[in-house]
């Protein structure tokens, strides 16, 4: 009887001792999961155009890299830039032209671009009537709801007009007074406008309502353009190189997913990001962007792309002087991630 008691006691001790490392390991693991580093990302708009970013969020790639990402939509590059400069955002996602403007104004802590997501414009020209044989010269004498002066949507639009022999100031009327994201509503409520320049899902929504028809893709007609990129203040990048690398790694995983999956698969992953849009519409939009080669295979912001951007700014009269590529672009994190 005593032997049985001793054996039971010994077994209990062995179990307790064996369990200690496992308990400690579990606590360490739990503790590790709780120690995700918080990062705030301010995006210029919430659009299917940025699908690789939402894939990275929905697939948990940021968490895998140890980051707790908070996503805020700024509704305009000017607002994203303000959030970056004020410190409300750690990382911004917008057109790189905003960083050039800030640099031109003598920013003491320059906003530097470190990853390029899109390589084409993501907006479309929507007409009030069906125009299967549309040509850019059809805009002569017509009214178009455009974008903010100095913003990428408007500058790329004007870049295309000039490529097709049109003078944006003389050959047509461009309304630049409407806030970003409000042009589709303005188009349905203002019969005086013949065309509007829209991102998705607004372009497809207008088509579904029978209120407009996509007649041209600015992304196709402008050619490859460094449309949107990720940026951060120089001081933040210098203090947090690990965070910058982890963030870029997560994005690259999203890029890899998009390159290796179908539009249908991509749409299913990002569907939770767009609760007001049905899956069929999301799929159609993803396919539209997919087919026109919207997303890069890597995040490296090449010098040639930066110089093309400056050409567009110069052509639009928005560039005081050309900025050295090395001053506003850092490719270290993107190269490491690719």
Question: What positions do the PLM features span?
Answer:
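Predominant activation on well-ordered alpha-helical scaffold segments within soluble catalytic domains
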Residues: 54, 100, 158, 204, ...
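C-terminal solvent-exposed extensions
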Residues: 308-338
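Pocket-lining segment of extracytoplasmic ligand-binding domains
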Residues: 129, 181-274
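Short, glycine-/small- and polar/acidic-enriched structural segments
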Residues: 29-177, 186, 194-200, 211, ...
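Soluble non-cytosolic domains of exported or imported proteins
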Residues: 47, 74-78, 93, 151-152, ...
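Short amphipathic alpha-helical segments at helix boundaries and their inter-helical linkers
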Residues: 89-93, 290-303, 333-338
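Short, low-complexity disordered leader/linker segments with a strong preference
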Residues: 1-38, 335-338
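Secondary-structure end/capping motifs
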Residues: 238-320
């Amino acid at each position: 009887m005593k032997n049985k008691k001793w054996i039971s006691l010994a077994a209990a001790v062995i179990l307790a001792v064996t369990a200690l490392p496992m308990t400690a390991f579990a606590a360490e693991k739990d503790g590790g999961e709780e120690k995700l580093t918080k990062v705030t990302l301010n995006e210029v708009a919430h659009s299917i155009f940025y699908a690789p970013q939402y894939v990275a969020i929905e697939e948990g790639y940021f968490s895998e890299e140890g980051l707790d990402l908070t996503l805020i939509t700024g509704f305009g590059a000017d607002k994203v830039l303000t959030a970056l400069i004020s410190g409300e955002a750690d990382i911004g996602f917008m057109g790189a032209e905003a960083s050039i403007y800030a640099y031109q104004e003598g920013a003491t802590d320059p906003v530097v671009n470190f990853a390029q997501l899109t390589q084409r414009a993501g907006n479309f020209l929507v007409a009030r009537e069906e125009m299967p044989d549309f040509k850019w010269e059809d805009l002569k004498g017509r009214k178009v709801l455009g974008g903010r002066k100095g913003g990428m949507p408007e500058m790329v639009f004007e870049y295309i007009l000039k490529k097709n022999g049109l003078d944006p100031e003389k050959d047509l009327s461009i309304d630049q007074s409407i806030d970003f994201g409000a042009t589709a509503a303005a188009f349905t409520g203002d019969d005086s406008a013949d065309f509007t320049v829209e991102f998705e899902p607004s372009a497809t929504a207008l088509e579904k309502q029978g209120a407009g028809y996509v007649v041209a893709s600015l992304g196709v007609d402008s050619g490859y353009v460094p449309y949107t990129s990720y940026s951060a203040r120089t001081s933040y990048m210098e203090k947090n190189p690990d965070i910058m690398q982890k963030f870029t790694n997560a994005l690259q995983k999203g890029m890899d997913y998009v390159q290796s999956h179908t539009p249908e698969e991509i749409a299913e992953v990002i569907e939770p990001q767009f609760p007001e849009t049905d899956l069929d519409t999301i799929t159609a939009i993803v396919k539209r962007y997919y087919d026109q080669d919207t997303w890069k295979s890597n995040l490296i912001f090449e010098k040639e792309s930066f110089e093309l951007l400056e050409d567009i700014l110069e052509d639009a009269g928005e560039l005081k002087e050309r900025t050295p590529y090395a001053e506003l672009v850092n490719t270290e994190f993107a190269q490491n991630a690719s």
